[in-house]
Each structure stands twice: as structure tokens, then as C-alpha cells.
Amino acid sequence: MPPDSLRLYGFARKYPAKTMMTTPFEDFLKQHDEESWSATLTTLLRSIHEVDRNATQIWFSFYPLSLFLALEHADDPETLAQRLLLQGKYYLKDQIDSSHTFLYGHRYWPEVKAAVQKYAREFSASFNRTLADQILAVAKHVAGQAKLDEALVIGITAIAFMTIRQVGLAAFEAAPGQVLIDKKHARKSPAEVLRERAVDDSQGFLSFLKTIDKKWTVTYDENDDGGKYRLNHLQDLAWGAAEDRSRNWRELDPRRVEGPIPVECRSASCGTCWVGVLGGAEKLSDVAAREGKKIKEFGYIETVEARPLIRLACQAQAQGAVSIVIPPWNGVFGKYLKSRVNS
């Protein structure tokens, strides 16, 4: 299933683009609302490599078009951001190269970025292909040039298209287009990444007799050997992270008051601790009533899935090793967007 955040209340329909000089490609992208992007992603997911299938959905949940449009068309975006309790880096324009480092396809970002830029500049309104078909065409071109599996660059190509939608082609072209992970991690194969995500911690001799004292590893940055911590069986992700004192977390991100996962309340009241689950979603507890209700109010996801890819870390309890990604921002915007559409 595509990320439900793409379906956020049809917000794009309510706000036509502001008048400005744009390219035909940008005009084409502006014709597509959340529903259209959701359908596009559904089509693409069938072709995206397993290593990036979850990651691509998570990225689109982290950077919803509806929130961008709300801010873009607000009379005073800064005041609206304060009203929606937005904290951290929520604009894609500030992280064109870095927002997708958790995708395997990020390794091919320079090639993808160059190809998308060229395609955008040569785009004509007479092109009669769907958004999904155009993304697939660019990905196929990149794969052919780089001699790699096309499935590895479909997700990152879709991200490039959405990034242009939110930042504009000129800003996209101005970004350096750098790979922001080290060579050691960049050399890993998709199979290696998937294998590491699937491994559970050994519990030692006679582990089958253990019930309470099992411990699991939570990886929060697959591109950092130290980007992980251990927690107890059935301990929630946020509580386990609080015991990680390996770094000065506040210095890295003021939202991180203790541990790598930003927290405030620990009771699903603030929305600070949301995370995406790259691997091991099935090894987390089911979404309980409160988490399901609050995560919709925050605006992060609309779903009835028992174990979705977007979770509140203070509610999700570990039953095995998992790999997560921590978004660089948080807010409370679900009710606002819904009220604007219904008004």
C-alpha cells in the first residue's frame, strides 16, 4: 500500500499554485494532487526494489505535499508553522540532497538528479504519459547509463520529482547533488542491507527458555555503525532510546532531550517521537487505540493497518530487532488540514 499521508484530505485541490514564472515540467507536476501521487506511488511500488519499498513510502510520509501547500499558501507561513507546532527541518528546500540518505537509491543521487534535471528542461506539455510512466522512463534511462538494476532507482527518481514539486526546478538544480554517506556503507549490496535488517539478536544458550530478559537492537541510522541501541523485550522504542548516552543529543538536535529519538511527553500527546520503520514492522506491537487516534491528529498517517510503517516511538513496543529512520521535524497538523478541506 502507498503511504496514507499522500491521501491527506485532498488538500492540494483547495490551493491553486501562486502565479509565478514556471517551466512546463513544473506546471505538469502542479496538476497532481495527493490522490494522484498516491495512485502513482501504488503503481511504482510494484517495480521498486524491496530494499527501498518501505523507505520510499516513508519518505513520502515525511514530506507530505499537503503540508507544503498549506505553508506555501499561508499569508504568514511562520505564524502558521507556530500554530501547527512545527519543529525541526520540515522544508525540503533545506535538505534537497540529504532528505533521502536512508534510501538505498541515495547512492545514485548524482546520476538521478542530473537525469531528472535534463528531463525537466526538455519536457514538453505535448508529452502524453502519466506521471508514473515518466518516472519509470527516467529511472530506466539512469539504470541503462549506470548499468544497474532499474528497480534500485525508481524510488529515488520519484523522490526527485516530488522534490522539484516542492522546491522548484531552479533550487533543485542549484543543489550540489552529493552522496552523503561514506564509501564503506555505500559499497553494501541491497542483499546485505536486507539481510542486516532481518537479523534478530542472539539471546545466547537456552534462549528458548527466556521470556522477560530478551534484548533487541534498534538501528536508527543504517549508514552509521554506531547508529543503534539496545532495549528490553516489549520496551517501547522511545524509552529504550533514552538510555543511549553515547552522544550529546541536544547538540545534534534540540528536540533530542535524551537519546536519538526526540521526545517530550511519552504519552502520545505531542507527536514529537514519530519514526519510520524500514525493517521489522512486524516485530513491533500492534497500534493501540490511542496511538491510532493521535497519529491521525498529528497528520502523519491515515491507516487501519495494525503495524504500519509510521509509528509513535513512545507507543511501539519491540518484540525483535528493528531498523527505523527518525524524521528531522515534527508537528500537529492533521486537524488543521482536515478542517481547511471541509470548510
Which functions belong to the PLM regions below?
Residues 6, 10-11, 15-198:
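Long, compositionally biased, glycine/small-hydrophobic-enriched stretches that function as flexible linkers
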Residues 187-219, 225, 308-343:
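Short flanking/linker segments adjacent to small metal-binding domains or redox-active Cys/His motifs
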Residues 207-226, 256-269, 273:
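Generic detector of contiguous secondary-structure segments
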Residues 227-259, 280-297:
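Short, charged low-complexity linear segments at domain edges
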Residues 228, 275, 283-285, 324, ...:
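Short acidic, gly/pro-rich beta-turn/loop elements at beta-sheet edges
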Residues 259-283, 304-319:
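Local cysteine-cluster metal-coordination motifs and their immediate loop/turn environment
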Residues 294-308:
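Aromatic- and Lys/Arg-enriched surface recognition patch
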